[in-house]
Regions:
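N-terminal loops that bind phosphate or other acidic moieties
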Residues: 1-346
Length: 346
């Protein structure tokens, strides 16, 4: 795996950015975390006048071999059907991408079945689903490397079009299981605190899911490095997302993070290069059990808390207007001086 050269944010701008915000024609700190967000984006871009251009939302879809062990309420074919739905415009991610002004890219990373009937779905299929990681590694080292490269390639293309805002979504029945395993290894939290209902499991279903994942942990006896965790337990769509997020941070893009699954991807990215988190904006706190703990482990502040747990990147896109508001505040508001208002605080 290559080294990701993510530039550190420009911390020398902290004081001048705060001074600029405090001279805007509003009471001090009255916009709360929106002001912090504006400061973060200024530091990401290295300027007191940040801008947001050409937001792109990429959806990676793939299947997971561990689904054969009954870790999900939904059948595997839902991955195939919903990926078609993305392309046909009926899915929430499709609707929200149009609503919030994101260019939408849909990628077959490893779905079981032929998706060529929808030409707008880009075929980057590694294989028809991963192997069952309860029994063997989910993918080969070569497949893992290919996934990272594919994610990077899409971001390079987006950047060439002027994109500096990236949102990543996923579709893959069974991928909350991978996310739980990554969370367990990377945070050190007990597996039981990392496993939730996913697509709607009963209490008995969650207990069974925990048993399957515990068996996968017992099988793996290697060192839990990021490379090994991606290879052993990863999904093709999730490893592509890791590559995309890291490549976006290398280009100083604002990276919008969705819920539980994409936060696990962000967690993985942060263990590959800790600078990644300086470019990550967490859209919302998911209803999925464990997400709040994962956010806390990364020191992340989600912008929304609406009880959502859909996936697809919809929570990230819904938070984008808040990001736009933060940038507009910093770059378009008048100052006390320009607006003829007495500045009544220090």
């Amino acid at each position: 795996m290559r080294q990701y050269n993510i530039p550190p944010i420009n911390r020398e701008l902290i004081t001048p950015t705060r001074e600029k915000i405090d001279h805007l024609s509003k009471s001090k700190e009255s916009l709360g975390y929106v002001e912090t967000l504006a400061e973060r984006i200024a530091l990401m871009q290295g300027t007191l006048s940040p801008h947001l251009e050409h937001p792109c939302h990429i959806l990676f879809s793939a299947d997971h071999g561990v689904v054969a062990d009954g870790v999900s309420l939904a059948p595997q074919i839902i991955t195939y059907q919903q990926t078609l739905n993305f392309a046909r415009g009926g899915a929430c991610a499709s609707v929200f991408a149009q609503l919030y002004g994101f260019d939408l890219t849909i990628v077959d990373a490893g779905v079981v079945g032929d998706l060529s009937i929808e030409p707008t779905i880009i075929n980057r299929k590694i294989a028809e689903g991963t192997r069952n990681y309860r029994l063997e590694p989910a993918m080969t080292p070569e497949q893992m490397e290919r996934c990272l490269s594919v994610g990077e390639e899409f971001v390079a293309s987006f950047a060439s079009q002027g994109c500096n805002v990236l949102s990543v979504g996923e579709m893959g029945i069974g991928n909350t299981s991978t996310s739980s395993l990554w969370m367990h290894y990377l945070t050190g939290l007990p597996l039981g605190e990392c496993v939730g209902v996913g697509s709607g499991l009963s209490r008995e279903g969650v207990e069974h899911k925990l048993e399957v994942l515990s068996a996968a942990i017992r099988r793996f006896t290697g060192t839990p490095t990021p490379e090994h965790l991606m290879q052993e337990f990863g999904g093709f769509e999730l490893v592509m997302a890791v590559g995309a997020m890291l490549a976006a941070a290398e280009r100083r893009m604002v990276v919008l993070i969705d819920g539980f699954v994409m936060s696990a991807v962000a967690l993985m990215a942060s263990h590959i290069n800790p600078n990644f988190l300086d470019y990550a904006v967490f859209g919302h706190k998911s209803k999925e059990s464990g997400h709040a703990r994962m956010l806390a482990a990364m020191g992340a502040t989600p912008l929304l808390d609406l009880g959502m747990h859909l996936g697809e990147g919809v929570g990230a896109m819904m938070a984008y207007p808040i990001v736009q508001g933060a940038v507009a505040m910093l770059t378009q508001m008048g100052t006390f001086s320009s607006d003829g208002i007495i500045k009544y605080f220090k």
